[in-house]
Design a protein with these regions (language model features):
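Extracellular/periplasmic helix-loop-helix junction of adjacent transmembrane segments
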Residues: 34-70, 252, 256
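Conserved MFS/SLC helix-loop-helix module at the cytosolic interface between two early adjacent transmembrane helices
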Residues: 69-106
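Helix-to-loop junctions at the C-terminal end of transmembrane segments
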Residues: 70-83, 268-280, 364
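Helix-breaking motifs and short loop linkers at transmembrane-helix boundaries and internal kinks
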Residues: 83, 104-109, 248, 301-303
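Paired small-residue
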Residues: 94, 98-101, 109-118, 306-314
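Cytoplasmic helix-loop-helix junction between adjacent transmembrane helices
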Residues: 108, 114-152
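C-terminal membrane-cytosol helix-exit motif in multi-pass small-molecule transporters
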Residues: 181-201, 387-392
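C-terminal transmembrane helical hairpin of 12-TM major facilitator-type secondary transporters
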Residues: 282-326
Length: 402
């Protein structure tokens, strides 16, 4: 990637971030349309028990996240040797087709399967795209390179998710998913034109990539991120019902809430990337402290519109700032298994996402109320901080060798 002009680098980074925008939209749009999905795909259950139907519709979020968990390490480990640009293009083809299938399949079970398949390329895309972005930015700016790619995901929550949610409310959720598929098709063109050719790791082998999992620090970083995002998704997955049933606003206010949380995620991601370039572990500890405070604020004030919006902004910011810090930590501790570790981070985050969405649904289905997932988020912060402390203690005893 040497010799690229600054405008070409910016175009390449934009193309990579556009893919993140599409991924953020396809992953998060279900949150704002979860009642629409429940009513259309589970009409009998929705008519008899709306709480149970909404909780079951949450499985669509869980299925996507589990697809990420399965696909990220598998694709990354098997494809580390292939040229990175070509691999990104194939992953975008998979995203486009699976999202179209999500829009067109007729039953809940088939849509559930399509969401699982749509999640398969997620972690591999982000893992490879962040490595490409880090190489384009150069030494000393890795965290910012990672944050630029992830900014596509967070900006999706400011623009893409609210607009697609509004489209889904007006034209139907199936039209919404077709619109998401068009974003992936556009990204394919952008990556093909703007991203420079970059060799894969020709020395990579499956056994070498898997050696990353023999490092305790890799596991600690993965679990720290998973637990942090698990707490976030316990709350975020059910933000739509909170808006309508706790705050007492109409469906039209859901996109507003999504914009606010997206702004928080965007600012948090960029701030977290810069902070990680100075102190990775310090950033992780600060993120957890802010996350606890913001969740407590959400639980106490979400019944008012100002309290809801301020709390969602803070929750999104704290959770999103954690992601580039964890990704940078993995670059430090993964040795020569960079591709797999980068992708495995997104698998771990989505394992946390699926766990958070599931546990949040359990508390709602149990009749504990739509704010009960906040307790799940707070409880998950305890092991998250504990794992980060263990990582620092081990590092002080045995300095990192990468």
């Amino acid at each position: 990637v040497r010799g690229l002009t600054p405008p070409r680098v910016r175009l390449a980074l934009f193309a990579l971030a556009l893919g993140g925008f599409g991924i953020g939209t396809t992953e998060f749009v279900a949150m704002g349309l979860i009642e629409n999905l429940a009513a259309d795909l589970l009409p009998g259950l929705y008519a008899s028990d709306q709480n149970r139907a909404i909780a079951q519709a949450g499985w669509l979020i869980t299925a996507y996240a589990l697809g990420v968990v399965v696909g990220a390490p598998t694709i990354a480990a098997l494809a580390a040797r292939f040229p990175r640009k070509q691999l990104l293009l194939w992953l975008l083809v998979a995203f486009t087709l699976a999202t179209v299938a999500s829009a067109l399949l007729p039953t809940f079970g088939l849509v559930l399967a399509a969401r699982f398949v749509a999640g398969l390329p997620h972690g591999a895309y982000f893992g490879i795209a962040t490595l490409v972005a880090a190489s384009l930015m150069g030494e000393g700016k890795r965290g910012r390179g990672v944050a630029i790619v992830l900014s596509g995901l967070t900006i999706a929550n400011v623009i893409g998710v609210p607009l697609i949610t509004l489209l889904g409310q007006q034209a139907g959720w199936r039209i919404a998913y077709l619109a998401v598929a068009s974003i992936f098709a556009l990204t394919f063109v952008a990556v093909a034109l703007a991203v420079p050719f970059q060799e894969g790791d020709r020395a990579a082998t499956l056994s070498r990539e898997l050696r990353a999992f023999r490092r305790p620090q890799v596991w600690l970083a993965l679990l720290t991120g998973a637990i942090g995002f698990g707490g976030f998704f316990a709350v975020y997955s059910y933000v739509g019902p909170v808006v309508t049933r706790v705050t007492g606003m109409g469906d039209a206010f859901i996109p507003v809430a999504l914009v606010v949380i997206g702004i928080g995620m965007t600012i948090g991601n960029l701030a977290g990337g810069r902070a990680a370039d100075h102190s990775v572990m310090g950033t992780i500890f600060v993120c957890f402290a802010l996350f606890v405070a913001s969740l407590a604020s959400f639980a106490l004030t979400a019944h008012t519109v100002p309290g809801l919006l301020i709390s969602l902004f803070l929750v999104g910011g704290a959770a999103s700032a954690l992601s580039p810090a964890v990704q940078s930590r993995l670059m430090d501790v993964a040795g020569d298994s960079q591709t797999l570790a980068a992708a495995a981070n997104h698998a771990a985050l989505n394992l946390g996402n699926s766990l958070g969405a599931y546990l949040g649904g359990v508390t709602i289905a149990a009749g504990l109320g739509y704010l009960s997932p906040t307790v799940v988020g707070l409880l998950l912060c305890i092991p998250g901080v504990a794992l980060a402390v263990v990582s620092v203690v081990l590092q002080n005893k045995r300095p990192l060798s990468v």
